[in-house]
């Protein structure tokens, strides 16, 4: 499958609003039933014991995803400031980060006006489409991940990628997997599309895409 085919497949999946749509698209591409293209999440066949014990409600799982987007935006800003997020020079709290990166007085969103708040909010979008069982999309302008980094970020458990960053909220690298317990009814589907934010300039890789399913 060349890049043109992968791009077409990715766009088709991104436009899908139902589980059946996704299954049909992947079946036509001869991917759904091909065991060779599917890998165990985090490389472990016991991953569900962790994934299935994150949040007790779908609301909590969704909030965790948004928190990860907030972290991604703050990390991007930190890197663009030329600061190593794990260093002593990095902000020691989310309030300090908001004050430094977004010039928010006392680091509290309540201290800024509607215009500034709206401008910051444009970094993250939550979009719902479909009818009875909507498809939920979370889009952020955060740091992003290159395709080669997927296995150690989006598709990992307990890696602690953010454990040394004092200004982020999701430190343990597994809370975002909680949505997999509340996804589409049969296969718990999740589509991930990402690339490294071009403002960071530490990777020349293009877009990456993966589908997560429960088997």
For the regions a protein language model found, what residue spans apply to each?
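Bergerat-fold GHKL ATPase/HATPase_c domain
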Residues: 1-122, 128-129, 148-155
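Short, solvent-exposed secondary-structure capping/transition elements
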Residues: 74-82, 147, 163-166, 188-192
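Bergerat-fold ATP-binding/catalytic subdomain of histidine kinases
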Residues: 153-168
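Non-catalytic alpha-helical coupling and interface elements of nucleotide-dependent molecular machines
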Residues: 70-74, 159, 184-188
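Glycine-rich G1-box
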Residues: 143-144
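Acidic ATP/Mg2+-coordinating residue in the GHKL
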Residues: 140
